[in-house]
Amino acid sequence: MRALLYTLLLCLFCSHTLLAQDQKPKLVTWQDIAALPAPAAGMRVAYGTDSLQFGELRLPEGDGPFPVVVVVHGGCWLSQYNLQYMAHLSAALTAAGYATWNLEFRRVGDAGGGWPGTFLDVAQGTDHLKAMAKQYPLNLKQVVVLGHSAGGHLALWLAARKNLPRQSALYVRKPLKVKGVVSLAGIADLESYATAEGSCNAAVPKLMGGMPAQVPDRYAHASPMRLQPLKVRQYLVQGALDPIVPTEQATAYARSAKSKGDAAEVVLLPNAGHFDLVAPQSPAWPLVLKSVREVLRQK
């Protein structure tokens, strides 16, 4: 009898373990996004003379003028990753009523990429909306910058660059004003990320031309954490199961931002990883879309 009871308890434990394993969320991967049918292409618009200085503009149906989401792709700032994986997100945002400007730019491995070219490209691409608004129905009083991973870093930086000193290599006069930022698994603290281990972490000194101790002034001008307060609404959407960008990147940044008077909110998704945030078919998508709407709702 005792042996039978032991056997039943063992079976119950094994069944519970298997059920728990079955209930683990299936995270979206890079391959999942790459396998999706390509959405209709946006209008390709050049913002500079280099072949990589362009963006894809998508406009909703109707007359406009439309609120604009500047989309900045990730990929560890490296040349082998381009804007294409953000096309599905851009198309979904456009279907929801937003004009999207999906930026391409020179990256590490491209001629002119890295410091300072990568930063100057995304700045130039964003500011080019001023010229584009003369031709397309864009509402430049309603601009949100949204970026993923390394693009989340650049999105936050785009909203922060107004705080740069004039002597900075990244300084641009009268940058386009943005209403806020939605950072999806964004790398908000460049210095702490550079000194941690990981393949994407190792790309930071390649982007910056050295480690924080070697080129401290560059990090001071490139890390959103060092350029606070941004004085715009910020949503940091983060998957708790992200193996590439730790949750602390979002939470530490938000704590620091709030201490300086900024409105910064972490949206933590317990069952999401790194790529769930940019997949419109994922359960994370409604919260991403809500974050964009909340930024634009602010007066």
Per-segment meaning from a language model:
Residues 81-89, 103-142:
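Catalytic nucleophile-loop/oxyanion-hole region of alpha/beta-hydrolase
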Residues 65-74:
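Short beta-strand element of the alpha/beta-hydrolase
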Residues 243-249:
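Conserved alpha/beta-hydrolase "acid-adjacent" motif
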Residues 22-63:
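N-terminal cap/lid segment of alpha/beta-hydrolase-fold proteins
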Residues 230, 236-238, 242:
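Short beta-strand/loop motif that positions the catalytic acidic residue
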Residues 29-40, 50, 160, 192-226:
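Mobile cap/lid helix-loop segments that gate and shape the active-site cleft of serine hydrolases
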Residues 272-281:
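Catalytic histidine-centered segment of alpha/beta-hydrolase-like enzymes
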